[in-house]
Amino acid sequence: MKRIGLLGGSFDPIHVAHVTLAQSALAHLQLDEVQLVPAANPWQRAPLAATAQDRLAMINAAITGLPGLAVNTSEIQRGGATYTVDTILALPQDARYTWILGADQLANFCTWRDWETIVRHVDLAVATRPGSTLQAAPELAQALLEAGRSLRELPFTPMPVSASEIRQRLAQGQNTEGLLPEGVARHIAEHGLYRPA
């Protein structure tokens, strides 16, 4: 059975830390593929700056030529508010899936819509800082155990980059060299994204 990792996010824009995390998950978790899952309209976030079409184009530009990385457009195709549980339930059943998340997301995982359903269908992998200890809420640990699912650690050194910082730099005409994959930077420049209105 194929082993697929899922990395969700707004990817507004996708940056080098996203790509590095996906590649780390592919290798460390011994996955066959990592699919980047751009949100249509994330329920816990402010409205997105770039259109779905531009975010998809940037993701494709970022992963071109990188074996094992792919894009999953299910949330964008579905549209509306984006809930992880809906994405999970729509997955083909011919693979074993691992949802990749950050330690900050793990801390509030039990507030996600139908989180118990999510853990019945996917394993979890949490990107952790070197030297940190992975701790899940007792109710999450119990639900994973009952579902026969795992919670795995994905050692990952955080990178000093965030999409909001990149958007701010671009709006102010500042340098973003080294923060964006080359194809993403090119798409942003060619389409005038993230410039002040």
UniProtKB/Swiss-Prot annotation:
InterPro entries: Cyt_trans-like (IPR004821), NadD/NMNAT (IPR005248), Rossmann-like_a/b/a_fold (IPR014729). GO terms for molecular function: ATP binding; nicotinate-nucleotide adenylyltransferase activity. It comes from the Bacteria. It is an enzyme of class 2 (transferase). The keyword Membrane does not apply. One of its GO terms (biological process) is NAD biosynthetic process. Coiled coil: none annotated. Keywords: ATP-binding, NAD, Nucleotide-binding, Nucleotidyltransferase, Pyridine nucleotide biosynthesis, Transferase. Pathway: Cofactor biosynthesis; NAD(+) biosynthesis; deamido-NAD(+) from nicotinate D-ribonucleotide: step 1/1. It catalyses: nicotinate beta-D-ribonucleotide + ATP + H(+) = deamido-NAD(+) + diphosphate. Its EC number is 2.7.7.18. The keyword S-adenosyl-L-methionine does not apply. Pfam families: CTP_transf_like (PF01467). Gene3D superfamilies: HUPs (3.40.50.620). Belongs to the NadD family. Catalyzes the reversible adenylation of nicotinate mononucleotide (NaMN) to nicotinic acid adenine dinucleotide (NaAD). This is Probable nicotinate-nucleotide adenylyltransferase. It comes from Bordetella avium (strain 197N). The gene is nadD.
